[in-house]
């Protein structure tokens, strides 16, 4: 039992905000963030450059830009407070930085949900060599 508890604590520490973001994405799309949105287009996944390939990829571009405007905490590791109320994502807590990170994730998850019809499997594992002419935020 103690080993299970230690593993759970370690997983929470490692996943942090990325787990929360993935949970938001699943709630809004019914898709796995890891399987569907990591390494999609030019912006979904680690890093990002080039021109967004479709509306789904643009959600990731806007999310990257939003993270770039967050000051005072690491967006990918920060653990924030949020809930789901009547189908909506509600960010909570008093820390302005954590709320900003939550809002970035909330807006992106909603964007994915609103653009499910643009998701195109041809952009999954899209070669980064095709991502040129980077747009500005």
Swiss-Prot record:
EC number of the protein: 3.1.1.4
One Pfam assignment: Phospholip_A2_1
GO molecular function: calcium ion binding; calcium-dependent phospholipase A2 activity; phospholipid binding
Cofactor note: Binds 1 Ca(2+) ion.
Intrachain disulfide bonds: 42-131, 44-60, 59-111, 65-137, 66-104, 73-97, 91-102
One of the record's GO cellular component terms: extracellular region
Enzyme class: hydrolase
Places the protein is found: Secreted
GO biological process: arachidonate secretion; lipid catabolic process; phospholipid metabolic process
Tissues expressed in: Expressed by the venom gland.
Names of required cofactors: Ca(2+)
The keyword Kinase appears for this protein: no
Active site location: 63, 105
Keyword Signal part of the UniProt annotation: yes
Listed name of the protein: Neutral phospholipase A2 ammodytin I2
Source organism of the structure: Vipera ammodytes ammodytes (Western sand viper)
